[in-house]
Amino acid sequence: MSFLRNFFGTTTTAPEVQKEQKEPVRALPASWYTSQDMYELERRSIFSRKWLLTTHKHRVPNAGDWVQYDAAGYKFIVSQDEQGEIKAYLHDNSLSPVHVHIDRNGFIWVNLDSSETPEVAWTDDFDGVDEQPRFDYYNFDEYVFDHTWDMEGDFNWKILADNYNECYHCLVAHPDIPTIADLNSYYVKTKDGHIQHYGAQRQDQIDNGFRIATTYFWPNASCNVSPNFFFMQRFTPVSPTKSVMRYEVYRHKDATDEAFTLISDMYKRIMSEDKYLCIHTQKNLNAGVFVNGLLHPDMEQGPLHFQSTVREVVTQHFNKEQAAGHEIWPAKPPFSVDAPAIDETDIAFRTGMDTYADADNLQESLASNLAPAIAV
């Protein structure tokens, strides 16, 4: 924890997420992609309390269907009960219920906050995201679950998000993409907890089934939908320097084998190419030489929005913990008043975290990073 205090300083003011940047902005420092303390803070501030896009109702279409998921060490189950309701539970001894939201397109979101009402409402970050006009071209009820696949790699989950949300590398790294979209017209729209990706498409590309709508859902999920298929991608953190890229693939009920295989295999190639880009990026960060660079306000607008949101959320949570004098884990169920007293040393041992009295490094490190980020 000493890293945290050195980074943040005694108290910090979380910078607002900028809607429009005119000058380059300082990126997150390399230590945020390697530090165990920062990873634990992200587990508390992000994955314990924010809404996580997880799956689609077609994944559990029948009563009794269930699937286990994980997010930064939190394991939970999504199921359909005998009454046809979609529910979720922590995969622990108590099977504590998890908050669920199903949007108008059938996507299932979970919030691991153990409070009766989550601190963060779904509409706080995603109001209207399921009503994008471009979704009018698709009927999500006409798709069926087809298969899953995944890739594990030695990279921080944020590297995956940074890579996904810009495309100036696409022309060189992804030879398939120019066949389905005009990279010269690529741009993103950012709002609250989502990043919408756009690129003009020729009529022949649309006729071949490549009318594609792509959205990134902060913190760690995305969806690409086309007339023949859609796939969901989740960047699942395992440690500060290891993540799993998990995919759920859905097929339109009228898609031919040829049309479905064409686009499904293409995206598998693209995602595999991204994996190796991210592995090499993490290696550079692990070397300990690079500190942080600048983000271009236009070409890297997606990563800029993603990183600004990370910086804001973790800083606010750290300040809340400072005021409380202890770590705050929203996903942990409150202790019953009838339960035996908990030994504080036992809690510290289980979490593997140092006490706040030793948490100097992260606070100072954050403070030193936030100042230039705000100034620029």
Where do the protein language model's features map onto the residues?
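C-terminal catalytic domain of Rieske-type non-heme iron oxygenases
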Residues: 3-4, 60, 77-82, 99-376
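N-terminal pre-ligand scaffold of iron-sulfur
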Residues: 2-90, 100-101
